[in-house]
Structure formats: C-alpha cells, structure tokens
Amino acid sequence: MDFHIRNSNLQEIEVRRKPHSRSPKIQQTEAEATAMNFRIPATASSIPTKYQTVFIPTSEKNGFNSRSLRFSYSLTQNENPGPGAYNVARTSADINSVSLSKKGTGGFPSKAPRTLQCKIARTPAPNAYNVYEEFFSKKDFSKGNSSMFQQPIAMEVEDTNHLTPAPNQYSASLTYCHPNNNVSAHAAFVSKTKRELLKPNPVKGPSPCHYKINDSLVKESTKVPVSCFKSKTSRNSLNVISDNPGPASYDPYKSSESEKKIIFLRKHYLCFSAPAMPIPKAPPVPGPGHYDIVDYEGLPKQYMSGAAFVSNTSRWAGDVSGKSLPGPGAYHPEIPGRYSFLYNSNRKWVPA
C-alpha cells in the first residue's frame, strides 16, 4: 500500500507500509531498504499494527558529492489561492451596507437600494476545475542533468536540398501507352475510325533546330518612359540574315565561262561499259549588270461595274493617251469608184 505525505520541509515523501513480521523475507527487505537509504523508525509503534512504515525520500542523487538543491522552491506548492480563499456565499448587500444605521431606520425610510445589485454569475467554483499537470510552466531544474550529460538542444539538420529522386525512382504510367478501347462488343458494321487518344505513329514534325524563335515576346521591355507615337522600325540590324551574295561575290570584268561540251569517246559510246558522264555544273548566277530594270507599274485598271444587271458595253476606251494610234500621215485616202456586177448562171454576182 503506497501513498504520499508532506513533511515540515515541504518535501514530498513516499510512504510504503509493509506487513510487520520478522520472517527471513522481511529481514531481507529491511536490509535492502537500508542499502537504498530508506528511513526506518528505530522504535516500534505503541499501537499494534500489521504494517511497518518506511520513508522513501525523493531527493536527488549525489552528483559530484553535492546534495544541495539548486532551487529552493518545491513543485508541490501552488502560488494560486486555494478553493477556501474565495467568498462565494450569496449574502445580501443591504445587511453589510455602510449607509444603513445600526439603530434602525426612521418612520419613512427610503426603499431604494443604496448599492447596485450585482448579479452573481453562475460560474463554476475554483475547485471545480481539473487542471492537468502538463499545463504548468514550472519545471524542477534541480533534478535535471547537467549539459555535459545530455545532447545539445540545437541539432544539426540534414540538408535535403540535394536529395532528389533518381531517374529510376519514378513510376511511369502505362495507361496512355496502349489503346483505351475496352469495348468487348462487336457490331456487324464496324466503324474503322480509331478511338485511341494518342496516335500510334510519331508526328513527323520539324526538329527543334528548324525553328526560328521570335525573341520580341520573351525579352523584357525597358522601364523608361516611352512616347505614345513609338516608331516600329527595328533598330537591331545585326539579326537580319540575308541569303543574297555579298558585295565581293561579283566580278563585273570577268568573262562569262562557256559551257564545256561533253566529248563522248568513240570507243565506249555504244557499250554498256561506258564511263559515267559527268553532271554539268549549274550556270553562274547573273550579276548586277545583267539586269535591265524597267519601271513596271502593271496593267492599267479596268473599271468594271459590280451591279446586278451588268451592261455588256465596254467602258474601257483602251489607250487614252493615243500613243499607239496611227498619226495623220499614216492614211492614204482614196475615192471609191463605180463597180458593175453581172449575175451569172451560178447565181453569183461577178464584177464586170
């Protein structure tokens, strides 16, 4: 049977009662208690009992031959007032009021109360709470180990920035690697349209090196004030790549190379063992002096009507300037003479 008591030094002492007998087992227990620094009363109690009281102190073990506590307070003490310190009795304020005379009241006493009627809140009493020990901020630092016998508080945290999974740790989903058509029914007229989401054949598209990325949408714009009428002319002329030949590619004074004629050998001309004929080279590209540039504005406009009932009469008079028309000296006017005709037997008019 174990219970706790409190002595005059406000130290909690655990008390155990054992059967009071002098058997060899009890004597062995007393010897063990003496070895464990238990306090056993020297004199037996005057009242005959069946139990023997043994005091087990809860003091700290000797550390570096020092028994004194580092802090004098005890954890069993509570700084808050106890439940009996509160006056929660419902007493009337008029009985202990200072404004009332001890000899009584007059003939016409006022019935108005001199004090405000404070309503007592229906709250639980202080002893109705059951506070757990984990909420107390007190800690007995007297029984704690020194810093040299315990691990440091600040532990080294493992660096997890470079702990990335390996490529073989991923589980690739195989749901999209095969057709998703799980229909087991088979109709009489089966449609040949594929139901797969992904195409089985790879897309024959250009490789990434065939793209020309426009950097105008990626580059950040300057954070300087810009005019509302901003010029759209590109100032970056270095990125303009032209496929035309450079200025030094032409030689205007060089004679044009004549095409070399293929000379067929007479010996192997009509044989299957004739040598392969060389492929003729491409003719040279014409230079700047080979062109005859003419200001060509295109065909003249033909103004056509777009109404529903279009007239067939031509509205285009042709060359209005008259450059292609013959001049006055281009005509040879002749006076037409008189002709006579005879009607022959074949019923045709023949000039006479």
Curated annotation (Swiss-Prot):
Q: Which UniProt keywords apply?
A: Apoptosis, Cytoplasm, Nucleus, Repeat
Q: Which Gene Ontology biological process is one annotated for this entry?
A: epigenetic programing of male pronucleus
Q: Which organism is it from?
A: Xenopus laevis (African clawed frog)
Job description of the protein: May positively contribute to the induction of apoptosis triggered by O(6)-methylguanine.
The UniProt entry's GO CC annotations, sorted and at most eight, read: cytoplasm; female pronucleus; germinal vesicle; male pronucleus
Name the family: Belongs to the STPG1 family.
**Subcellular location field:** Cytoplasm; Nucleus
Keyword Cell membrane (UniProt): no
Name the Pfam families for this protein.
Answer: SHIPPO-rpt
What protein is this chain from?
A: O(6)-methylguanine-induced apoptosis 2
List residue spans for each STPGR repeat: 80-90, 124-139, 165-171, 205-235, 244-263, 286-295, 325-335
Q: Which GO terms describe its molecular function?
A: chromatin binding; histone binding
